[in-house]
Amino acid sequence: MEEICDLEGDDRELFSDQLCSIGEFARISAAHAFPLLTALLENRVCKLEERLTALQTAANSGSPIPPIQGMENLFEDLHWLLLIAGHMIADESTGETPLIPSAVVQYSAACVERTDVTATLDFMFGSQSGALGCSSMDKSRVDPVVKLVTCVCCLASAGNKAIASNMAHFLSPQVAGTVVWFLRNFTRSYLFPDERDSVELSASLSSIFGKDSTGGKWMIGFLLDTVRANLTYWASEPALAEDTVLLLLSLVDTKSRAEVAVSFECLWQLGQLQASREGPISQLPAEVHRFYVQALVLAGSSEGDHPLRDRYWKQFLQSMHNRFGIVCHQPNFVKLAQKEPIKAEVQSLLESFKGVALAVNAWNVNELFDFLLPVLRDSVTLLSVYHTCPEVAVLVLEFYVNAVEAFVNFLSQTQANHLFKACLSLLDTYTKCNMGKHSLSSLVEEEQFYDLLLLMKLLSHMLAQDILNLGPDDGTEKISAGDVTLYGLNIILPLITVELLKFPSLCEEYFKLSTFVCEVYPEKVVALPDGLFHNMMSTLEVGLSIYDSDISKMSLESVASLIEHFFKEMRENPPQRMLEIVRHFLRLIFNMVLLESFDMDLLQPASCAFHALICSNQGYYTELVRSLLAHQGDPVISQRLLGAFHQLTPSDMKLSLDKHSKAQFRRNLDTFLANVKGFLCRK
């Protein structure tokens, strides 16, 4: 126990595996685990309410605050009970639709005969009045899953009341954060679940939390009150503020929940606080503020017909637009830009615009594009003004990355053209502002080259527009995403050095981008100017020889794409530099696969590249084989090698890159390596 107490960090992360296992085991014996956890939580919530009541009574009477023993242990119990309960009722999911665990649904369904929906709703509604766990109300007719959730609501309600009574300093920020984490997990899985994704719900869970249910609507209102209370008092607590804003985001990240959320006055008040930038909201950390804006925009762009919806959304976005205009369009902005209040306001606005970009979806894309496009254009000027101020310049680049990623697959061609023109303007400005800035002498930390990393991500997102575009075709002449990407590569490639590629994040992003470009636009890559072309080929060579298997795999895939293009389109009239590249990489991969320590996990991409190179220059491949055989001192080994090479590339081998030929060569190479690699490999 002492070792656990000495650990620093978030318990949710430190003990994630253990908590997930406990949650799984609890579901296996749900009939035992749910009543047990509920009873333990009720007991601790009652104790907390009793102690808060004693403190409130003393404060109201003017008496000295009595010493309260055991509060630390009580908060510790609540924290861990909430963590266990949260992992029992729902799984934490990333990148997939959260579902109610089937074991929980089955347990609720098994209790349906003794469950009364009206009694369950009354029990849940009573949590807002407090002291629910200590009441004499008959709870035998209450759904056991809802009973557990209601205990947590009662704890949240106790916290809300303490905040309203100026007693929040007696509470634990850690417990408050765990409460909203639990409620967020619950919200994402249980509140208005999509029937197309969910397993069939029990009758009680469907009646209480299903779409258009009274219980679901009440719960959203209660949770919004909790969000408002927390942000009123806890905005300066980074971890708790983030958990609270993520709870708010979960309440509006589906249309069904957002349409209900906008009907509550509490949400409008949260929007007004953001618009005025008053009070504790202004203290939110940058990333939390970004999620806060995202949540408010999602709420405002729900498809409900609430009469205040349009006014809310326009007022909220208009306030940001007005602030941006006041700061950035003033006549003497360039002179005032470096003053701290101005710079801080610019940073705050850029974080807000990043939040708007995160809120883009298929239903609001046109409105948000019209709102953000002028800001994107003006942000190019900000990059020029603040190019010597990394903390602002990076925000501009991050804003572009977020916006392009959000918009690119939903835009009409006219909209995409406007976006790409803005990106070209950004790239031009970056070039002018950073001419000669990057050199090895300035290489101190990876963060200094974060701008290059962001530019690569920007180019990768633009490429996606040519691959997957769901936007309408309006017949407008197209600006090619590939051309814009190659234009950006012209800027980035001269700055990429072997030393820079030693930074893992930069290295991975560069090879992802280069692989993408080589696979989709090989004809544009082979047409690059000599300097840029050879620079890119050098980085691919480095990727083959230095880095981990993921980087080597991407380098091999890039080489295969370029050589296949050469074989199919350029073999009849080959440029000299491509002939040299074919010979160079054929020798490299020949040695890599046959003579050096080779990772067999790379067999598939290596086989594709090796096969394409052999087909493109079979004569040079034959020279390499003869040279290898000539250097064998043992005639037996030489003869064995000769036989193996005949099996690898038989004399009647078809010089083709069709699917069958590739598969046959891969099988041959696998057999070849199994037979002779042991005595060929040079350690």
Tell me the role of every PLM-derived stretch.
Residues 1-683:
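Karyopherin-beta/Importin-beta family HEAT-repeat alpha-solenoid scaffold
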